[in-house]
A protein has these predicted regions:
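C-terminal motif of bacterial Sec signal peptides marking the signal peptidase cleavage site
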Residues: 15-17
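Sec-dependent signal peptide recognition
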Residues: 2-9
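Feature for extracytoplasmic/surface-facing segments of secreted or surface-associated proteins
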Residues: 21-155
């Protein structure tokens, strides 16, 4: 049980630090902002991982692409597990995105804004528990542990 408590405390501390302001003055509530990062990811796919397999499958809901701050604004928070899929040039998931709308998404790939002139080298997926507005390597570890042990809750 101590392992779970330490994991929960680590996530709470990490997520608390992610809730700060970016200095903007937009006070209107325009929806739920989902942020994906390991460095901010620009043009990463955000989707609902409805079958919890850690992959963006063709039948799963495509919610949108992240911006240069790693953010995507949604009208409402989805109820299922959120996930973020990076895209590499000519990769399988890039082709899956292009199949949705070739005109709109041709040539789209993910960039880690820590290295903005480079495309991502590998397709990766990070997941987050349904209550989280942040998708990161830490939230992915939490989602994995929760999937392994149904007794672990988000609280």
């Amino acid at each position: 049980m101590n392992k779970v408590s330490l994991l929960a405390a680590s996530v709470a501390i990490a997520l608390t630090g992610c809730g700060g302001s970016d200095g903007g003055s937009n006070s209107a509530n325009d929806g739920v902002v989902i942020t994906g990062f390991d460095g901010y990811f620009k043009h990463a796919v955000v989707f609902e991982d409805t079958n919890n397999n850690g992959q963006w499958d063709t039948q799963e809901t495509f919610l949108g692409l992240t911006d240069e701050k790693g953010q995507l604004t949604l009208a409402a928070k989805p109820e299922k597990t959120l996930a973020l899929q990076t895209l590499v040039p000519n990769g399988a998931k890039q082709k899956q995105l292009i199949a949705l709308d070739a005109k709109k998404y041709a040539g789209t790939y993910t960039v880690d804004m820590d290295h903005p002139s480079q495309a991502m080298a590998h397709e990766i997926v990070f997941r987050a528990p349904s209550s989280s507005n942040v998708i990161s390597p830490i939230t992915d570890l939490v989602a994995i542990e929760m999937a392994k042990d149904p007794a672990i809750s988000e609280e």
